[in-house]
């Protein structure tokens, strides 16, 4: 048992000052934390949730109780130190988490690797990366806010990567906290088979402790910082409720677990171990979600949560991780990676995050198989580049601790490795093994950006190069038509944060233009083409003919571009087909209606013709350019715009005003719900109509309303919106005639 948490039962009172004993126990040295444990004694967990649910505060308490840090600081504390995991100055100033921070610690002789992730929708890719490499997660929910929009996003991401999770209902001390409502929302909104394994003894200011339904004991957190745990009998006034909730827990478990279900049907008695074993099995299979309660800020419920992480979340050996061996002309062969920490199999690791540190590029990796030692050579499966390992580090927020070797299941970092996030590394370059990479959403907002001083251009270029490499949702390009540098990302906040980081970290103040929506252009119906590109200018000329059809993809694929080669025979030689595809993808960068990218289109190359001397890849590329210009003229086109899922919460008296404003912004209301004087409305609103909404909501709800939005899909614009976008584009290109002239004609 950890020295910091003591169990106090009866008169056997262990009274040791925790911080005095830390030094004697060797907690100050990193060696205790970085010891290599057997696989059963390792957990890789993430802490993720909606914005402001208390993830970072919870991580701070976990680090304190496990002896990793000697004192606690609050996220927005009066001492201005900030939480350990919010290491970026901007994070401490704003009180939000922007980047995932990694750390590892020790609890009851088990090594726990923790990744603290952002809750803000603009930083979704950070959560994606973290969940991809974790074996389990703690889903933190606010006892007041309950299941919110980003909670649903995180839930979808966990489902995508099959991550088992525990739920922790935090902030029991807040006014209006209602953990029972949160549980019913988990069942209705997230479709979780969930039940309490703990109950709160009082909420709001009466929050005294928790009831453990598995052990049937009350737990109180006493002493300084709630370090002393006292077990007692369940309070008299809670015994009936505890029995009912325990029965409910057993029923939910029996539905999901065969072994317990048989005992339940045969009406045999359960032991504590039976319930714990069933909880572990169902949690790992994602058929049941145990719900714990507490308040991290008031130091209640954190130690039992750590026990639950050990008891119910899987170790790396209990999770199946697959690699894929690419074979030409065949489907990739699936290989189950060996999680044993014996080093018998070759090393396989996945790079899941890049960061430019003070000492060069830092690459975060998870080791899935084998062992990696200092001095080893590894190969990037995508580029086949060899890298020699000069330095291996484990991370504790922004501090590094050197290690000599890492085993399967460990999370670690390397310096000076040239790669992209999602790359697979192996020690054997011949096996062509790669792991499924990380899902990256498309950016939806663009802004013009320029440095305030021309002398800062070098630093500006360095910052852009670093940020685009670190964050795959942050894009950068130069628009030749308007001679502007544009950056695109997941939202206004996302781009504002990068602008502020340029000033803080590179001394390069920048000006951001107005947000621009990333519209797309697509075809309404199929359009055939037959284009001949012929050029003779002395010597060998250029000759290429292509015949085919361009057609729209189904609405659920309208962000994709497809190219299909349907040619038969040698009219279009196979070596020239890539030229046609290249020409098509080049032309897709800029549409005719509004200058935005094309998407949701399939290009079917069906036939063509070539000349034995004059045909070349370049000629076929130019033929594709000509064919698409032909389709621009002959086809029927429309503009697509990003639609956002918007969730607004405000007091009930403002419901009419909020609904009216959303309708005015072309929003479609998809649902509403109300609880205790507050209402929540869900709507789908075009992103183009959402700019300036934050100010409008504040003024119409006396500052009490709040909203979140996240990208949902692309959908066709309204006709008048499309006409306006086309007209603005034509005017900017000098193509439009003034209205007055039209009237004269």
Curated annotation (Swiss-Prot):
GO terms for cellular component: mitochondrion; nucleus. Residues 40-317 form the tr-type G domain. This is Elongation factor G, mitochondrial. Keywords: Elongation factor, GTP-binding, Mitochondrion, Nucleotide-binding, Protein biosynthesis. NCBIfam families: EF-G, PRK12740.1-5, small_GTP. HAMAP family: EF_G_EF_2_B. It holds the Pfam family EFG_IV. SUPFAM superfamilies: EF-G C-terminal domain-like, P-loop containing nucleoside triphosphate hydrolases, Ribosomal protein S5 domain 2-like, Translation proteins. One of its GO terms (molecular function) is translation elongation factor activity. It comes from Drosophila sechellia. The keyword Phosphoprotein does not apply. GTP binds at residues 49-56, 116-120, 170-173. This protein may be expected to contain an N-terminal transit peptide but none has been predicted. Belongs to the TRAFAC class translation factor GTPase superfamily. Classic translation factor GTPase family. EF-G/EF-2 subfamily.
